[in-house]
Each structure stands twice: as structure tokens, then as C-alpha cells.
Amino acid sequence: MRGTSIAVLIISALVIAPAGCVNRTARSGTAPPSTCLKDLNAIPGMSAVLKSRKHDSQESQGRPFEGMEIALTINGMVMSDIDPEADADDQCFTENTPENLDRLAKALETNAMPPTMSFISGKWFDERMEKEWLKRGNLIGSLGYDRLRRRKSTAEQFIQDIARNDAVLAGLWGGSSPTRKYFRFPGTRPWRKNRNIDTVNAYLKKNRYTLVPATIDLLDASFSQLYCSALSRSDQSCSNLIRANFRTLALDTTLRARSIAKDQAGHDVKHILAVGANQFTCDNLSELLAWYKSLGARFIPLDEALLDPFYASANAAAVMQEARSAQLAAAEKR
């Protein structure tokens, strides 16, 4: 895609329709473009990115991700049944279906992806779906049972939460615990300055866990609610605008994470990308992966990414937050 600018990238997003989504009760009506854009700008970092990149296109020329090696990971997994008691404010309450797991798995298969790890919280554990995910050749890690907040939990509470999730996931291993297990701290803020981290890390190491931070977070969950709302009212213009803005944010976030990590490590590190198991991802993952590849990225297994010495330091966990801060700082300079 030589000579491609951000404008062209956005236009390409506008013409790509999702592969199909779970049927919803349609509500008539189309939101004015200004309303749709206003909702998008409320997403953390979105308005900052649009402002900072308004006059910049040089970074998007050619294949801006050329040379990047990225491992894809997924936070959570859709469940097998729609919850009839779901919060009325949850626009995506119908995302929990086997069809959406199939859509995620097919997106990986279509793009010849390596086995992809989904990090599971026991509170939302669905044995049928997790077993199907493994059956499709993918992997499962732990996100803790209840996704505890680091600032409101002691080390002992965190350890108990991890152990509780261990017990839930044990049913997936057929009676024999895997030789290597994977854990991701919930949330996006780094733990390196938290007084509890050493105690929790010692527990994880003792129990054969490998820590898996993410260096790139695309905030897809924030886009998903707006996307589901647009689909429910058959507002194709708004859903197209959502996808276009998502790619703009993805481009900016990925390039900033690459630059920050390279400055810290002294080399182009192998990155770990995190997306959520939500309706937006289910519908658009296949196109997103193809887009990353078209811009030069190569997807690699998670274990290969973790071999990068960068992940032996505490810096890796801070890259996401630093990229977000850099986006806001760039906008303020305009």
C-alpha cells in the first residue's frame, strides 16, 4: 500500500462492512453525523488523536508497521447465552452467543494466525465456550476471578483471587495442570510502583505463571457500545464512522507504542496487542488483522513475543499508559 495516507486508510475503513453480526431488535432512526462524532470524541484519546493528526499524514505513508512483530491476545470471551437480565444500558447485551465465538475463531483462521490466548475471568466462566476455544487450537490464560482493582485490593486479596480463578480453570486441563500458565493483571495502569506487586509476583512465579502485559490496547470496548447502538437502529453511516475512527486510533496507538518501547529497550521490540471479546471485535477482527498485515505487521505466537528481553523488565507494562499520555500531550501542543 505504497503512498497511502491516513485519509485513504479512513476511506478504506468506511467501505468495509462487518462480516455479519448477531441479530438484534432494530430500532429505526439515524443519528446525525455530528451526534455520532460527538459520542466518538468522548472515547479517551479519540479527540486527542484526531486533533494531533489533523495535519499529519507522513507517518502513515507506505507500510508504517513494516518490521513490527505482534502477538494478538484477547481479554475475556463471549458467553454461550444472552442474559435476559442484562443491564438495559448495555447496548451489546446480545453479544454472548456461540456464533460470536465462531466469528472470532474464523477471523483467526482466515488470517492464518498463530494460536491466540484469551484471558479468562472465572466470574464470567463459560465451560462450553472455553473448551470450544481450546478445541479450535487456541489458548487460555488467567485474568483473575473478579478482575480486582489494584488500588482497592491487598496482595493477599489478589492472591486469593488468582487461586480462585485457578480452581475454575482447572476443569479445562483434564486433571493435569499445564506446565506453563499465563496471567495478565486486569486494567491498563502499570503495577510497577504498587507496594503489593512483589508479593503477588512471587506467588505467580511459585505457581508457574508467566506474566503477560500488553503494549498495545486499542480501547475496542469503548467503541463497541457505540457500534451496537448504531446497529440497533440500522445506522450504517454511524457504524462506518465508528470503524474509520477506530482505525485512526489504532494507527496512532500502535505507532506510539512502537516508538516508546523502542526508546526504552534500544531495539524494535516484539509487541503484544490486546483486544476485548465484544461485538465490535467479533464483527471486525478479521478485517482488522488483514489491515495490520497490509501495513507491514507480522503476527507471531505469544511465546515468541515473550522471549524479547523487554518483557523481563517492568517497563513493558507501562507502554500502554505512556502511549495514551503521549496522545493527549500531542493534542495539547496543537
Task: Map each language-model feature to its residues.
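Bacterial N-terminal signal peptides
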Residues: 7-17
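Low-complexity, Gly/Ser/Thr/Pro-rich intrinsically disordered linker/tail segments
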Residues: 285-334
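Catalytic domains of cell-wall/extracellular-matrix polysaccharide-remodeling enzymes
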Residues: 124-132, 149-298, 304
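Active-site beta->alpha N-cap acidic-glycine motif
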Residues: 35-185, 288-291, 298, 305-307, ...
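Structural recognition of alpha->loop->beta junctions
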Residues: 137, 206-207, 325-329
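Bacterial signal peptide processing site
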Residues: 22-23
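Positively charged n-region of N-terminal signal peptides that target proteins for export
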Residues: 1-5
